[in-house]
Amino acid sequence: MSCVAFSFSAFAQTKTINSGWQYSENKTNWETINIPHTWNDKDAFDDAPGYRRGLGYYQKQIFVASDEKENIHYLKFNAVNQEATVFVNGHNVGNHKGGYTAFNFEITKYLNFNDFNHIEVIVDNSHNENIPPLDADFTFYGGIYRDVELISVPKQHLSLTDFASDGYYVNYYNVSEEQAGVEVKLLVDNFDSFKSQNHLYLKILDAEGQLILEEHKGFKLNAATSKDITITFPEIENPKLWSPNNPYLYKLEISLTDKKGNILDSKSSNLGFRWATVDAEKGFFLNGKPIKLVGVNRHQDYESYGNAVPLSLQKKDIELIKEMGSNVIRFAHYPHARELYKKCDELGILVWTEIPIVNKVTNTEAFVNVSKQMQKEHIKQYYNFPSVVMIGYMNEIFLRLAFDKKESDEEKEHRKQFTYNLAKQLEDLTRREAPNHITVMALHFNELYNETKIADLPMLVGWNLYFGWYHDTIEDLGVFLDDQHQRYPKRSLLISEYGPGADVRISATEPSRYDYSQDYQLLLHSGYYSQVMERDFVTGMTAWNFADFGSEFRGETIPHVNQKGIMQYNRAPKEVYYWYQSVLKTKEPFVHIANYQNELNLLEKNTHEVVIFSNQNEGKLYVNDVLYKDINFELGIAKIEVPLKQGVNTVKVETANTTDETDFNVELFQNLKTNPKSVLAINVGTHISFRDDILGVTFLKDRPYSDNLYGYLPNSGKCTKKLIPFNISNTINEAVYQTVLVDCNAYKVDIPNGKYKVTLYFVEPQLKNKTKVLFNLKEANDDSKADVMHRIFDIKLNAKTTSSQFNMAKMYDDKYGIMQTSEVNIAKNEGLTIQLNPIKGETVLSGILIEKLD
């Protein structure tokens, strides 16, 4: 094991001890790791259902010098998911439940001075009925994934034992444009066996570092006790107010000294003078002025890292969110790293922060106690950030109850009442512990929240709404909002989640619900934005989600990932990110040409709808260096049908103040006989095109057959298109396999004479998937009860049998991506005809790949 030596001075010091830990799953085989760390960064993304939820063991040696004997020592963990038991030199120093808030233990009496000390942490991310979250649409990565700190303080210091807070709380009073007051409540500990005389010195500095106000208070501390001290500053005249457009920050500096003036402890934090209110008719007000909240939700994980993400990348997230034009962020569904809240202070982003009581509760006293503990830790640790305006405690808490078929009606009524009672306790706790903040709760689309009256508890209700994705149409959002406002006119509301999944590899000329195209993502986001902006009573909207994130059970076009982000999992922007910039960024001119797929495949035409985003009113569009058209922007968008040629085409947009240019590499598909392709791929059973980045080929959308092109033949069966929203084993190209053409027995491709390699893509849609589907869709039913052994058919290419008695269920016990490859010689201008002759049941086909060999 690695060893680190420390020697502290006489005043408080904090050392980060992230490097050189040892980790093991079984206490036998150890590996050296650094914090942050998770053991689920890989297994939560493989083809095997589930991921390891259990015990993980960490250990480290630290050296503490002999001159540290007079100090008090704490071991602080900023987050461990989800339960941690800590040992120092074999002594159990404490246990903490909950994976998203900090905790610390005073370890002085367990230390050996002038010697090495053995630190051991047992981490458990097993499902625990008494620790929220019980169930959620995100992965519960196990591990020590935020900083570990060794804190050494003199015997008199700002308390570290008040729910692992900083030991002081900043309150504001009489804040207006004319004046603003600051009151600081501090908790000071004395670990000595005798009384002490101490002093507190507090300063307020402006953003330039100039002293504005200072206060001093002398006091006595009794032996082995703590003391609450309140220091009130006089009001500051004409303060500079904090807002998203002008995030002006003052600074509070705190020094604790002994009677001789020697500094024992010191802390500092941002001060931001602002006040926020909500009005059920007029929306959100900041500093007395109306402001429409528009921003995003954020999950903390990142591609390849799980939740063990370097702080530099996390801070970059906040910068990207601000650059998008956001004025609000919802840290979902748990407290995030404190450094990010500080970043929100600095950049001017209002914060909704919450604890992870998600989907359901357990009807036990232990669950209630852990929930209350979480909220107290949450409030006290994040209290001093001026960006924190909204504090929440539940998300979609009746989601499981609404779909639970096992509980009796009586049991459901009891659970409803228990949930309401817990919510009421947490609401009261939050209002008491966090005055001058707005309490919030997020609900899903269900009348249960109104029936139980749980929606009347918070000051602001957030609705997680997916009209046009899971159900109904985009336009139905406004109908719902108007209905809620009419029925509950005194209730303030915000759209706390919305958005469809989107895969940058997928495009659609006729986008529709649940097709995962970026085209549909733009339609939904812009449609929601329009409807929210038309309604003053809607406080605002936070898109779900800032970036794609891990959700192990999901089996979408990218398995184990929720793809509703406006950025990809690696933080590469999707096109809708740029659209938000066009409507939210007003200070600097902006224009962007959407390039959904650089490789364009145009079927039966030589034009393409180019989409342009800008915050300008008008511009000029150039195609291949020739002025094509003057354009106007509406809601930040211009859509122009543009003629393109085979090969590279340059498209440029100029506005009065800015310009953008991009290239489209165009492949025309107008006649496969006279303009043959070396590679032709077809995404059978769907209207979407899919780009296979590894093969470097686009699977074209499916279509009925027409001369000189391709498609399924008329009178060849029902030719029903089916969606399979599950992970497909043995492939990374789920988007090809997840759409199936059912009962379609003949498919023709008009390719010229020659030798070809033909690969057909199949999957058995009726096999029971091994992964539990938690968020089901109306049209995404699992046909696992069907007699799949009766799907048997022969495969023929130009009347030649390439596979007899083809039976996928007999070959595989899961939804497995199958490729059947054959070589075929085409002569006499006959083209290629694929025949699927049913023996039992209906035929299926998912994709076709044709490669010319000569």
Residue ranges and their predicted role:
Residues 117, 250-254, 649-651, 754-766:
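A short tyrosine-centered beta-strand micro-motif
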Residues 155-191, 581-616, 671-678:
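Surface beta-strand/loop "capping" patches
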Residues 12-76, 129, 135, 141-144, ...:
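Extended carbohydrate-recognition surfaces in non-catalytic/accessory domains of CAZymes
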Residues 35-44, 126, 131, 137, ...:
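Extended substrate-binding grooves/exosites of carbohydrate-active enzymes
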Residues 670-854:
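Compositionally biased, intrinsically disordered or flexible polar/acidic segments
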Residues 13-15, 24, 53-161, 165-167, ...:
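Accessory beta-strand-rich segments of carbohydrate-active enzymes
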Residues 12-46, 118, 122, 128, ...:
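Accessory carbohydrate-binding/adhesion or oligomerization-edge regions at the termini
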Residues 112, 185-279, 647:
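Extended acidic/polar, glycine-enriched regions
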